[in-house]
């Protein structure tokens, strides 16, 4: 939220000062939509542990690049520790990095992957209920 506040202040200031320099006024209205989706680091570690234990090395990969997406789940992550995780569903023989995205009309999925998704959720829940998050977050253990 600090970054959003700063961006709003800077944009407002720039608009007002630019307008003032030209003998005008400016009014900036910002409508805030969804908050950013920010995973809890401790919960990401828990997910990695659960998926590696249950599906083996290579079943979990951290995305090194932040994404600008937003999601209803963001509201939950503001209140509770958690992690937004992508499930690989590209059809066999298709490079996941080249597959059409979730909101594309060209998206195809390997429906067998859905069972893995359900099993992954169960594995994460089992790991959390049996081991918690190692004391990293209030209310998470």
Question: Where are the predicted features?
Answer:
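Metal-dependent amide/peptide-bond hydrolase catalytic core
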Residues: 1-141
């Amino acid at each position: 939220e600090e970054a959003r506040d700063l961006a709003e202040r800077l944009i407002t200031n720039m608009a007002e000062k630019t307008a003032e320099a030209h003998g005008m006024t400016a009014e900036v209205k910002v409508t805030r939509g969804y908050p950013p989706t920010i995973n809890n680091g401790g919960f990401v570690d828990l997910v990695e542990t659960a998926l590696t234990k249950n599906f083996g090395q290579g079943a979990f990969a951290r995305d090194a690049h932040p994404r600008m997406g937003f999601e209803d789940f963001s509201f939950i992550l503001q209140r509770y520790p958690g992690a937004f995780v992508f499930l690989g569903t590209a059809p066999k023989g298709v490079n996941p990095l080249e597959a059409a995205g979730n909101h594309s009309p060209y998206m195809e999925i390997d429906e067998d992957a859905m069972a893995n998704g359900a099993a992954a959720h169960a594995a994460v829940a089992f790991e959390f209920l049996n081991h918690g998050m190692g004391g990293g977050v209030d209310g998470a253990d």
